[in-house]
């Protein structure tokens, strides 16, 4: 409280007080290092460079924010759902940190109006707002630390926009979404039960692997075949979206399997980008109230 009063007094003498006030309305506190928040909203399409000539955009902050957001949301979900199993907690967290939810949250708090990007660039994508939200979390972490990040998520995001209990009951069928993607892109997908064992309490545990054109995509465990398939499909969808080397291996395997493949000219890079955007659209088709 005292810190905020001191910040308000200092603000009166700053030339950029309008920017500070804008961030205060979103954060609930005044930034200490406002440059972090400004960079969090700087899309790579602007081609801005630092004094040393390095690209200046929000990608590094996005990387950091993604990791911090996973930890914070995991922390919140763990404390809220006492006694729930790991699979339940993982799925609930995934529903919050998925790209469509982050896109909506960015709009709700007004980040979409603050993002700087080049209108001449064609590099914009359907998850630019969500990326900026993650970068914003990274900025808060560097500026104020983990606890402040957690308070921001609890008070400014979860409480006003997300009903955790309602969200946890909403089922997301990752297997059907992966199959839908494979059909759109003419890819062969298989689900293989590779192990069945018992845990310490003699409950059956299943492990499933997903392969695309014979290439291992992801594996998942669960207390039923369905749960293990869902977890494996979820991991595979993330890999499709975020691992270009994996997708290159899949495309190569598709060609070797004599299935019509995309051209390997530079246009194929655009095809891979389109596939990744399709993944975001497919993963995000469920309606989550934020």
From Swiss-Prot:
One of its GO terms (biological process) is mRNA processing. Residues 173-242 form the DRBM domain. Keywords: Cytoplasm, Endonuclease, Hydrolase, Magnesium, Metal-binding, mRNA processing, Nuclease, RNA-binding, rRNA processing, rRNA-binding, tRNA processing. It is found in: Cytoplasm. GO terms for molecular function: double-stranded RNA binding; metal ion binding; ribonuclease III activity; rRNA binding. Residues 20-145 form the RNase III domain. It holds the Pfam family Ribonucleas_3_3. Homodimer. Belongs to the ribonuclease III family. This is Ribonuclease 3. It comes from Bacteroides fragilis (strain ATCC 25285 / DSM 2151 / CCUG 4856 / JCM 11019 / LMG 10263 / NCTC 9343 / Onslow / VPI 2553 / EN-2).
